[in-house]
């Protein structure tokens, strides 16, 4: 019975190991091929508790009620005539689509962006460049003859992603439409031309940052907003604000208004005719695919709203909203942003796509501005999402309650004391809520780092995932929230602590190495302090540049007296950036950590090759962290405990095995006589196995491949041209003491002999070991040359240090053996894996 229990335990352990190995391969393959999908699966792990789905008819009926029933805007609105009467807009000219236009459009689209019903990703259009001239010709023809638009070109495929756990409600889905790649390329060509026209004629309002190129988007708006709110608070000024949210803004714009606004801004009639014709053919089918449950609806005609999924839709929507900004600016109302006693700038609104924030000096002004906004919205048949609209009135530093009534009778609720509103990702009331926002960001950052560390990614992919999935949570807040250096250091410390918790980082390993590039001996984690400072400096430069042409930016610079993290009013502020060179200097100065830096920079060491295992990043995170701790010499040896951390319980630093010398990490990795014939020999033999098998395959002595740790070399392999000895004594005429090299290669035709000997010394013995091997087998080389009538006999030392340092001589040795120059990668990996195993085993004794 006990035997069965033991067998069951062994099988269970093997199964768990197999499952973990399979998961590791799958996750790393997914990460390398589709990083976005990996993150999506990571974020949804444990949250896919979706059970009930809406029926196909319910899904169809709900979304067709939004999209399929056309509405017309109020063509008689007075403001439309005023907007159309602008004389400073030059008519847009039409030019044929050129090959250069197609090249530019294809280059702007992600190679592997999900395709539509065509199932052809943009990658193939990029690679088949011979098609570009044909596409340019066809696109030009379609623009000039919209009646020839192929039916498939305007057919979308909409994936419905659940927004909440209530998956039975069809309204609780977010539609993501995938359009045919050809349609996206065509509309990208159109977008580039429309954008040039819009830019040249300065059509888009300065307050709109939703699709403006060369701007900072949400961050720019939030910085301006912060300066306004802080000035109002510091100077105890009255301020009234309103947050306006539209109900399904993109999905509710009438097609009649979309065409009308193109004509108002004098877009070329050929392009307008094409877009008008294509709108009549817009249609999409909805599909839901959750937990194996699949639903696909019939086609839904799009008769209202913008066909989302291409680069034209955001610009088109911004143009549709643009007259509102003219109307608001024409009121001459707003908050007066003071630069000095005699100069101010009136700001009435800020906008990012459909997120509108309105500013005024008092409640009467905010009422008037909201009335203007409501009138515009009513004329273009767009509705406020009143549950997400709020007003805030502050008089003499106090929040004044009082809802606002719109002309149509709807009420916008006023914010109460203690209530906050989420604007462009940050909670705010009278000011941005710094404490709550920081806490939320730090929690989200920690959750993402934790989910990454729980995965089975290899070390390189894991660190890359932290940089690309977790760090951006922080990056968005840089320049908006007031982060102190202490807080940023604490975030970096928290990251290292979490890595230590998951056995990916030794608690006393070098901190400097974590943020250095991998090719320079680091782990390439993002330096958050440097990133923060670079962002601040970049944003400051942006505002200064924009101030040359923008009165708003110029005013914000003058007003920002430590109101935002940028402190724009101070022209001398320049945050320090710690360079990699400075980090190397500090690393080299460390008493323990600096020893590896010294070894790495010796003239006989190939620095790039020595760091190749880090650059590849294919090891387990635990193994990588452990080896770096070995290199940093912070392993709990007796010498470290007695002489470095001064452990009072340690009375001697002698080796626990041989009791001869001090137990340093160098002694354990390559200096203890008691494990020379076991652990060191196994490590040495595995490197020999790699070289022997590669030579045997090269010379046709073997035609199979076996993992080096399972490979068992034969003492003699021979064919008509080559003979290969392994660990075999060479019988000589005169007595030669050192007559047993690891490998002997005899080339019968060339009459040459190579005496190959492998060694895995400590870092400080690499050069001495090479010279020792050359001297050791010189006598044997002479004897072999005379006995075997060889025209050429060479000694070829294969030296790799116990922690993976590669001497420059190894490249020459591999050339002599005619092996691929990257063979050192396998040798290095075998050496460091065995070293890690040896140290772990030794410390457990």
Task: Give a label for each model feature.
Residues 383-419:
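Short, conserved micro-motifs composed of acidic
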Residues 645-649, 700-755, 799:
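Active-site metal-binding core of divalent-cation-utilizing nuclease and nuclease-like domains
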Residues 246-368, 387, 393-394:
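Conserved polymerase palm-domain catalytic core
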Residues 1-171, 181-185:
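Surface-exposed loop/turn segments and immediately adjacent short secondary-structure elements
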Residues 409-485, 539-550:
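Basic, alpha-helical interaction scaffolds
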Residues 111-120, 158, 169-178, 219-263:
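Conserved catalytic palm subdomain of right-hand nucleotidyl-transferase polymerases, strongest
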Residues 467, 491, 504-650, 654, ...:
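Extended C-terminal regions of large enzymes
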Residues 168-201, 217-223, 247-250, 302-335, ...:
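Conserved pre-motif C helix in the palm subdomain of viral-like polymerases
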């Amino acid at each position: 019975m006990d035997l069965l229990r033991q067998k069951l335990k062994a099988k269970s352990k093997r199964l768990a190991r197999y499952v973990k190995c399979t998961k590791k391969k799958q996750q790393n393959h997914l990460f390398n091929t589709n990083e976005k999908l990996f993150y999506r699966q990571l974020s949804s792990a444990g949250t896919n508790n979706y059970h009930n789905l809406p029926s196909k008819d319910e899904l169809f009926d709900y979304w067709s009620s939004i999209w399929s029933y056309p509405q017309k805007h109020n063509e008689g609105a007075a403001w439309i005539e005023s907007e159309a009467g602008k004389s400073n807009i030059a008519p847009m000219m039409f030019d044929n689509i050129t090959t250069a236009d197609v090249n530019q459009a294809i280059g702007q689209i992600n190679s592997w962006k999900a395709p539509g019903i065509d199932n052809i990703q943009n990658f193939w259009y990029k690679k088949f460049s011979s098609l570009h001239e044909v596409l340019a010709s066809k696109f030009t023809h379609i623009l000039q003859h919209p009646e020839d638009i192929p039916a498939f070109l305007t057919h979308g495929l909409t994936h419905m992603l659940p927004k909440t756990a209530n998956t039975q409600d069809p309204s609780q889905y977010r539609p993501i439409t995938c359009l045919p790649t050809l349609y996206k390329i065509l509309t990208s060509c159109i977008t580039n031309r429309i954008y040039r026209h819009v830019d040249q004629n300065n059509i888009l309002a300065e307050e709109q940052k939703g699709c403006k190129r060369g701007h900072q988007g949400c961050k720019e708006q939030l910085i301006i907003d912060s300066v306004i709110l802080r000035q109002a608070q510091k100077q105890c000024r009255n301020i009234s604000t309103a947050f306006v949210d539209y109900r399904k803004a993109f999905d509710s714009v009438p097609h009649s208004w979309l065409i009308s606004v193109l004509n108002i801004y004098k877009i070329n009639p050929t392009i307008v005719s094409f877009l008008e014709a294509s709108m009549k053919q817009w249609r999409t089918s909805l599909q839901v695919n959750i937990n194996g449950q699949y639903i696909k609806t019939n086609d839904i005609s799009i008769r209202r709203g913008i066909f989302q999924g291409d680069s034209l839709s955001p610009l088109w929507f911004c143009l549709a909203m643009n007259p509102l900004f003219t109307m608001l600016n024409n009121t001459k109302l707003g908050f007066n942003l003071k630069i000095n006693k005699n100069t101010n700038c009136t700001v009435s609104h800020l906008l990012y796509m459909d997120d509108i924030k309105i500013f005024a000096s008092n409640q009467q002004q905010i009422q008037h501005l909201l009335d203007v906004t409501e009138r515009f919205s009513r004329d273009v048949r767009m509705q406020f999402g009143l549950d997400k609209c709020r007003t805030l009135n502050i008089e003499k530093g106090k929040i004044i309650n009082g809802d606002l009534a719109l002309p149509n009778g709807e009420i916008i609720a006023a914010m109460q004391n203690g209530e906050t509103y989420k604007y462009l990702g940050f909670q705010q009331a009278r000011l941005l809520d710094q404490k709550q926002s920081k806490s939320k960001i730090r929690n989200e950052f920690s959750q993402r780092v934790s989910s990454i560390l729980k995965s089975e990614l290899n070390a390189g992919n894991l660190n890359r995932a932290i940089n690309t999935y977790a760090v951006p949570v922080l990056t968005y807040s840089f320049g908006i929230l007031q982060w102190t250096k202490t807080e940023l250091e604490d975030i970096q410390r928290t990251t290292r602590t979490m890595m230590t918790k998951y056995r990916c980082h030794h608690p006393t390993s070098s901190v400097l190495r974590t943020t250095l590039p991998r090719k320079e001996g680091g782990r390439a984690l993002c330096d958050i302090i440097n990133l923060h400072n670079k962002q601040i400096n970049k944003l400051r430069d942006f505002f200064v540049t924009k101030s040359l042409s923008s009165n708003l930016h110029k005013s914000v610079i003058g007003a920002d007296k430590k109101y935002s993290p940028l402190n724009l009013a101070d022209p001398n502020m320049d945050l320090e950036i710690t360079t990699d060179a400075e980090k190397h200097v500090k690393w080299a100065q460390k008493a323990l950590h600096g020893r590896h830096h010294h070894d790495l920079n010796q003239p006989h060491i190939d620095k790039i090759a020595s760091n190749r295992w880090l650059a590849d990043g294919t090891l387990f995170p635990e193994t990588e962290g452990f080896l770096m701790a070995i290199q940093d010499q912070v392993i709990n040896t007796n010498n470290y405990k007695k002489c470095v951390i001064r452990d009072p319980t340690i009375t001697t630093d002698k080796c626990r095995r041989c009791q001869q010398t001090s137990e340093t990490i160098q002694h354990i990795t390559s200096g203890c006589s008691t494990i020379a014939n076991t652990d060191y020999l196994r490590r040495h033999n595995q490197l020999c196995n790699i070289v022997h098998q590669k030579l045997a395959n090269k010379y046709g002595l073997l035609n199979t491949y076996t993992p080096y740790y399972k490979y068992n070399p034969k003492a003699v392999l021979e064919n008509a041209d080559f003979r290969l000895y392994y660990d075999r004594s060479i019988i000589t005429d005169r007595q030669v003491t050192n007559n047993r090299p690891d490998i002997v290669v005899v080339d019968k035709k060339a009459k040459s002999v190579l005496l190959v000997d492998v060694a895995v010394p400590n870092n400080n013995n690499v050069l001495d070991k090479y010279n020792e091997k050359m001297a050791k087998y010189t006598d044997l080389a002479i004897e072999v040359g005379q006995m075997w009538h060889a025209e050429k006999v060479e000694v070829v030392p294969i030296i790799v240090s116990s922690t993976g340092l590669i001497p420059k001589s190894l490249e020459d040795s591999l050339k002599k053996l005619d092996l691929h120059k990257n063979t050192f990668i396998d040798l290095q990996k075998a050496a460091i894996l065995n070293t890690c195993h040896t140290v772990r085993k030794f410390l457990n004794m």
